[in-house]
């Protein structure tokens, strides 16, 4: 035994020294079936060990213990085994192994499980055809057609094949692949005209592998730049050139830049016929003449007017001395109508809805009346003597000759002279002064009004003599009236009784009652028996001027009657009071006739106190 073992080891050592060894492990490459009826398997042999090596393929079917050897080693080439229809079963799984054997030993590959249904790899499609066609709109395309592999039964439905094509320009490197599905034709659009294209195709069953690419087929795309396209491009070029020429011509003609033509500035507002160059040069006269204007329109200084009125001129004949007859004062006065077409506004005073804008022109202020000192004493020491007035004291300005007033239109016979007292502050000052001074002021204003009225009448001297004879009796030469008449125009005459403001109700109505004076002393007024509200407050101006409007004609008449009853019965004042009462009655009549007015002109009040 030991000698035999030693001999074997000696042989092995000799073999190793010569470079011989057992074969290497072979590897099965793939198994493919072209039509599910036959299939072929290929392997890669290992090292042979320096000795001749024999390769064999054995297989067994799933569920069987019998091992089979490859039926055909020659049909499919070296290192392959072909299974014909006789040895192929599509519903069986094959377990395939490759064995390598030489003198030094043997080796086997890893087993491969094969299902003929999933190892199908068909042959490439055949009859590949390329055609260039043209649509109705003269657009060209490439039409590719092919046929299925020959050994594949596609018509009976035994196989369902899918196809792919690829193409590229002849000089390109990358292929453009298109999947066509189950179709055996395909249209390729948008190919470059004048280029030569190479096309190939392949197929694959439902459960298998892609076949090899077919042989290359080539086609050259025609140059489809037709005459129609050339004409279109020529027209486009001509139009572009014309547009460019028009733009250049417009820029050169107008002298504007290209940017101004493309992006014109936003135009500003303009007045038709308005020359901005004249305005910039400051030539206003030329600008106005271009606009058709002679000069700048006159500016108005009536912005501070409280109310806009219709301007009405007073008739000068309405300020005449009223008649001393027993008839109602003012009945004998017949005003003279002015021209209705004059600028005074009498032409439209019958319209109660028409108002004109008033813009008063500056009026000359009436002369301020001053009361001189009376140094002579009357013969009757008990008579009322007007007190000495301080020349530095402020006396009211009586605006007795104002020719205009702004109010609603009235009838010619209803125009009234304006009262000289309009300022509440001045009235309060007069009320606080002695009674004789206040009486002198009032008498003086009333006589001035009478004198102006007398001067307007024709035959002024005759009328003055008649009125003097009626006013002053000849048997009373020792009264103060002749003395005051000779001294100055400021004659002391006891005026009619005046009224005081008793209260102002919520509606702005003043309650007035007569003020009693006896023995040159002002008595405190008592509560009147019946207070008659006859005036309303129409408004208060900026100078604290209270604007009064007569409420009714009957109330004023009643107040005049009460004042006449309470007047003292002295003979010296009878004639003067008759004259003044006649004037007051005339004024009252004028005021009563204005009962329809709703307001007075505040601007007229303001002028009398300047």
Curated annotation (Swiss-Prot):
Short motif WSXWS motif, span: 210-214
Residue stretches in coiled coil: none
Leader sequence residues: 1-19
Topological domain spans for side Extracellular: 20-229
Origin: domain of life: Eukaryota
Comp. bias regions, Basic and acidic residues: 318-327
Pfam families attached to this UniProt entry: EpoR_lig-bind, fn3
Motif Box 1 motif in this chain: 262-270
Region ranges (Disordered): 317-355, 458-482, 564-584
Matching SUPFAM superfamilies: Fibronectin type III
Intervals, Cytoplasmic compartment: 254-610
Residues bearing attached sugar chains per UniProt: 54, 99, 127
Domain Fibronectin type-III span(s) in chain numbering: 22-122, 124-224
Biased composition (Low complexity): 345-354
Binding site for Zn(2+): 206-207
Membrane-spanning segments: 230-253
Homology family: Belongs to the type I cytokine receptor family. Type 1 subfamily.
Domain-level remarks: The WSXWS motif appears to be necessary for proper protein folding and thereby efficient intracellular transport and cell-surface receptor binding. The box 1 motif is required for JAK interaction and/or activation.
Protein name: Prolactin receptor
Organism encoding this protein: Rattus norvegicus (Rat)
Gene: Prlr
């Amino acid at each position: 035994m030991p000698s035999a073992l030693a001999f074997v080891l000696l042989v092995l050592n000799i073999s190793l020294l010569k470079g011989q060894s057992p074969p290497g492990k072979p590897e099965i490459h793939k198994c493919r079936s072209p039509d599910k009826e036959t299939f072929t398997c290929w392997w890669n042999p290992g090292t042979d060990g320096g000795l001749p090596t024999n390769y064999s393929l054995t297989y067994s079917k799933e569920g069987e213990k019998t091992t089979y050897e490859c039926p055909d080693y020659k049909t499919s080439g070296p290192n392959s085994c072909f299974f014909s229809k006789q040895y192929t079963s599509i519903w069986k799984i094959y377990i395939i192994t490759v064995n390598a054997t030489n003198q030094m030993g043997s080796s086997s590959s890893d087993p491969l499980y094969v299902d003929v249904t999933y190892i199908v790899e068909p042959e490439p499609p055949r009859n590949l055809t390329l055609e260039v066609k043209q649509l109705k709109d003269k657009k060209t395309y490439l039409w590719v057609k092919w046929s299925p592999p020959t050994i594949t039964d596609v018509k009976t439905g035994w196989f369902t094949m899918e196809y792919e094509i690829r193409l590229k320009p002849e000089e390109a490197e990358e292929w453009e692949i298109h999947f066509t599905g189950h179709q055996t034709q395909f249209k390729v659009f948008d190919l470059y005209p004048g280029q030569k294209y190479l096309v190939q195709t392949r197929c694959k069953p439902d459960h298998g592998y892609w076949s090899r690419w077919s042989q290359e087929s080539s086609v050259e795309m025609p140059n489809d730049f037709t005459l129609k396209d050339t004409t279109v491009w020529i027209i486009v070029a001509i139009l572009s050139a014309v547009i460019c020429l028009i733009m250049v011509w417009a820029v050169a003609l107008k002298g504007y830049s290209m940017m101004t033509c493309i992006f014109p500035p936003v135009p500003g507002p303009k007045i038709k016929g308005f020359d901005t160059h004249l305005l910039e040069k400051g030539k206003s006269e030329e600008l106005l003449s271009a606009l058709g204007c002679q000069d700048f329109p006159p500016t108005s200084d009536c912005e501070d007017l409280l109310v806009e009125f219709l301007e009405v001129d007073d008739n000068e004949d309405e300020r005449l001395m009223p008649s001393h007859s027993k008839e109602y004062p003012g009945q004998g006065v017949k005003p003279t109508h002015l021209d209705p077409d004059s600028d005074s506004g009498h032409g439209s005073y019958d319209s109660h809805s028409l108002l004109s804008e008033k813009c008063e022109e500056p009026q000359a202020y009436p002369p301020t009346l001053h009361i001189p000192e009376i140094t002579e004493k009357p013969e009757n020491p008990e008579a009322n003597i007007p007190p000495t007035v301080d020349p530095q004291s402020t006396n009211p300005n009586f605006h007795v000759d104002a020719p205009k007033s702004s109010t609603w239109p009235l009838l010619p016979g209803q125009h009234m002279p304006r009262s000289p007292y309009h300022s509440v502050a001045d009235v309060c000052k007069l009320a606080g002064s002695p009674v004789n001074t206040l009486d002198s002021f009032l008498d003086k204003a009333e006589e001035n009004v009478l004198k102006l009225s007398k001067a307007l009448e024709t035959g002024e001297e005759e009328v003055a003599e008649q009125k003097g004879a009626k006013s002053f009796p000849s048997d009373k030469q020792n009264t103060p009236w002749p003395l005051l008449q000779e001294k100055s125009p400021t004659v002391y005459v006891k005026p009619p009784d005046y009224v005081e403001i008793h209260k102002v109700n919520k509606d702005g109505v003043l309650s007035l009652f007569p003020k009693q004076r006896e023995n040159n002393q002002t008595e405190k007024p008592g509560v009147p028996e019946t207070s008659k509200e006859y005036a309303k407050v129409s408004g208060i101006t900026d100078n604290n001027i209270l604007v009064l409007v007569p409420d009714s004609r009957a109330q004023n008449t009643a107040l005049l009657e009460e004042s006449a009853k309470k007047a003292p019965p002295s003979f010296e004042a009878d004639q003067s009071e008759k004259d003044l009462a006649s004037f007051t009655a005339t004024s009252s009549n004028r005021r009563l006739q204005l009962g329809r007015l709703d307001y007075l002109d505040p601007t007229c009040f303001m002028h009398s106190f300047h």
